[in-house]
Amino acid sequence: MTNIRKNHPLIKIMNSSFIDLPAPSNISSWWNFGSLLGACLALQIITGLFLAMHYTADTTTAFSSVTHICRDVNYGWVIRYLHANGASMFFLCLFIHVGRGLYYGSFVLSETWNIGIILLFTVMATAFMGYVLPWGQMSFWGATVITNLLSAIPYIGTNLVEWIWGGFSVDKATLTRFFAFHFILPFIITALVMVHLLFLHETGSNNPLGIPSNPDKIPFHPYYTIKDLLGLLLLILPLMTLVFFSPDLLGDPDNYTPANPLSTPPHIKPEWYFLFAYAILRSIPNKLGGVLALILSILILAIIPLLQTAKQQSMMFRPLSQCLFWILVADLYTLTWIGGQPVEHPFITIGQTASILYFTLILIAMPTMGLIENKMLKW
């Protein structure tokens, strides 16, 4: 058995990636979220495949095909709600995974970090297109509003939007192409995940201390496989609670009304995991400025390795930087809440303040605090 595991051309790749992989002996539960993201991706692909068997990407039948899945297909409602709430769990794990990378300085592994940012953008694009497919009111108007943002691009904006729409408004052509992209992107994400892991295994994993872990490593199996299984169990628990007890908790009631181009919902908003970026977009009165701020709110992650001024990689022994990190987390909570509120006083002011704070913390406060801590440690 050992010979097959170590000599077979395919199995030995699996062996060196998940069984005999030397892993740092001190990585905490914050490192579980990578494997949980893999589990979420697998769940989304499997449930999505079964949903695609019954879904029709046509404006006249899309809404009723989703209703048909829930009412007539055996356990169709379970598959549908596992897919919808699985996306929420996916993003929850994704945000924690990125947060852990920021806190413990994993961004110094630049190739892994940059592929991670590309993955984040791809997953966000996939989730956005998936939200359009049920063809409810919020699906239609969300698609209209978000795709329309591209019209802010000078010269080519209007042509670009009409090219994406496949006409002069969000219609059948838009729905069909969104379904096609929503189906293919998870497989592209899977390929990117493999590249992400390839780069990670080139350098080895970071650890909570932010120091080289070469002197003290343990095999991935059985230690971290058991640990990841426990994490998976703890993820399944809230997911199943959501699916079976309140499947529509994170959804929008407007999406149970079929799409109607002649009736605008009183408050157009995306799913909860996009609300922080949506709040930043809305906080700037200028359309192009808002779109740039929206993109930069995610793209800013790419320049974080350049902003690292502290001599210590991890924040574990930097209490002042820890304070700023948790202020950033609180700020993102605030932006998420603001994104779901109507555009009126005092929400506009709170949103603008939180948006300024978000960029200030990352671009100015954290690098400055790194320098201050170096001085305090006489480095």
Curated annotation (Swiss-Prot):
Specify where it is mainly localized. Answer: mitochondrion
Q: Where in the cell is it found?
A: Mitochondrion inner membrane
Q: Name one GO cellular component term.
A: respiratory chain complex III
* Matches recorded under Gene3D superfamilies: Cytochrome Bc1 Complex, Chain C (1.20.810.10)
Q: How does it sit in the membrane?
A: Multi-pass membrane protein
Q: What does this protein do?
A: Component of the ubiquinol-cytochrome c reductase complex (complex III or cytochrome b-c1 complex) that is part of the mitochondrial respiratory chain. The b-c1 complex mediates electron transfer from ubiquinol to cytochrome c. Contributes to the generation of a proton gradient across the mitochondrial membrane that is then used for ATP synthesis.
Q: What is this protein called?
A: Cytochrome b
